[in-house]
Amino acid sequence: MSPEKKSQNFPPITECRDGEYDSIAADLDGTLLLSRSSFPYFMLVAVEAGSLLRGLILLLSLPFVIISYLFVSESLGIQILIFISFAGLKIRDIELVSRAVLPRFYAADVRKDSFEVFDKCKRKVVVTANPIVMVEAFVKDYLGGDKVLGTEIEVNPKTNRATGFVKKPGVLVGDLKRLAILKEFGNESPDLGLGDRTSDHDFMSLCKKGYMVHATKSATTIPKERLKNRIVFHDGRLAQRPTPLNAIITYLWLPFGFILSIIRVYFNLPLPERFVRYTYEMLGIHLTIRGHRPPPPSPGTLGNLYVLNHRTALDPIIVAIALGRKICCVTYSVSRLSLMLSPIPAVALTRDRATDAANMRKLLEKGDLVICPEGTTCREEYLLRFSALFAELSDRIVPVAMNCKQGMFNGTTVRGVKFWDPYFFFMNPRPSYEATFLDRLPEEMTVNGGGKTPIEVANYVQKVIGAVLGFECTELTRKDKYLLLGGNDGKVESINNTKK
């Protein structure tokens, strides 16, 4: 490979013909991704690994970043983004956000024509000015990349926190990208080079063929199904991609949204459930109820066991509102404060199978009971594996399909403080909830009446709920979710130890 090879004019990606290519070196922002700006992803790191205040500081610094980028150097502009977003953060928190938050937003921004070229190559290398720690998980797990050549951030070895500065040779732009390709490939030139700006010409000139990825209105993103892995789990409070405009709107709405969420929570708290359905609409919360709602149990008979898929912590409350009466629910983890503020009785499970079964049978003797056998929430259109314990408790099983829409904030979290979940949900300008009551399980599909095994009943309930919602049923569990998003097994003790 000749380091003296001059830069040249490269043809557009549309002229790249199908062929056998062993290796490729491609830029990320504006090349494999539709957007040329990495600001939204730095904003996500600043907010989700840091705080809303850090995100605000980053947003206010954007004019200075743009001026530095355009009139001083590309390197300086990116260095400012890195310093404000990363300085003082634990490297573990940055890694978790890169694995749990960023992939969902990156996945929605993958450019179709460049990814199709990238995907056909055997050896795939991404060369980017972004910090490696920020993009490596997505590139390898979802784009199928083999290596990421990017900017390395400096970490204080004593505290394991990012200093905000970068390691030598600095931010990977221009000639530094060329040197990184030389070091990675040696004398064997990459077959293809893809870039979107003139500063990419340095490394593209080393490739046997190079193509420019121009910003065009006709450019489209690929369906998420085309990625190497599906995105089932993700974390983070921000529901929409924080472009500068979205970020400004979010911060302007934040104080009003917080006040509105307090009103929405505490105004409805003392009201009877049969009235709350109407006050929700008054306060901008859209509630849709479908299906036949069973009447309360007769004295001396067991209550109905309402089996729900789990979208947010509000699921049991929405069912109580739909029924127009108080019903008890069981939950896997709940704070004392949340128990005090809950408008319906809530009982924490012990995770001891025999103890939990005995407690739930006692609750059913007193009346109706709500349970979410997935054990944790799932934001995407998937259902996790249903724990079969509920099928052993009663034959009076009523499946309920739950769904909700959140435009600005997510009302669930893995790494954050769960107490704030309902408040973030109600901070959305126009949140909506849907509850669809299905027919009670026929006797032949129960354990006692039909001779089915608990697992068969659980799988059947998962299937009928999934069919109504159009969700895919999976074998994934709470443990799978927390291992991916939080780096622990999902047990309360493990979660607390991780946060220390």
Curated annotation (Swiss-Prot):
In chain numbering, motif HXXXXD motif lies across 310-315
Q: What is its EC number?
A: 2.3.1.15
GO BP term, pick one: CDP-diacylglycerol biosynthetic process
**InterPro entries hit by this protein:** HAD_RAM2/GPAT1-8 (IPR056462), HAD_sf (IPR023214), Plipid/glycerol_acylTrfase (IPR002123)
- Lineage: superkingdom: Eukaryota
The question of whether Transport is a record keyword is answered with no
Entry-linked Gene3D superfamilies: HAD superfamily/HAD-like (3.40.50.1000)
The reaction(s) catalysed by this protein are: sn-glycerol 3-phosphate + an acyl-CoA = a 1-acyl-sn-glycero-3-phosphate + CoA
Tell me the keywords, alphabetical order.
Answer: Acyltransferase, Lipid biosynthesis, Lipid metabolism, Membrane, Phospholipid biosynthesis, Phospholipid metabolism, Transferase, Transmembrane, Transmembrane helix
Q: Which Gene Ontology terms of cellular component type are present?
A: endoplasmic reticulum; membrane
| Record-level Gene Ontology MF annotations | glycerol-3-phosphate 2-O-acyltransferase activity; glycerol-3-phosphate O-acyltransferase activity; phosphatase activity
The protein's annotated pathway: Phospholipid metabolism; CDP-diacylglycerol biosynthesis; CDP-diacylglycerol from sn-glycerol 3-phosphate: step 1/3
Please state where this protein is localized: Membrane
Keyword Lipid biosynthesis annotated: yes
Tell me the enzyme class. transferase
Q: How does it sit in the membrane?
A: Multi-pass membrane protein
Where, by residue number, does the polypeptide cross the bilayer? 42-62, 64-84, 243-263
| Main subcellular localisation | membrane
Q: Which family is annotated? A: Belongs to the GPAT/DAPAT family.
Q: Which PANTHER family match?
A: ANCIENT UBIQUITOUS PROTEIN, GLYCEROL-3-PHOSPHATE ACYLTRANSFERASE 8-RELATED
Per its database record, what is this protein's job? Esterifies acyl-group from acyl-ACP to the sn-1 position of glycerol-3-phosphate, an essential step in glycerolipid biosynthesis.
Supply the domain comment. The HXXXXD motif is essential for acyltransferase activity and may constitute the binding site for the phosphate moiety of the glycerol-3-phosphate.
The entry's protein name is: Probable glycerol-3-phosphate acyltransferase 8
Which source organism?
A: Arabidopsis thaliana
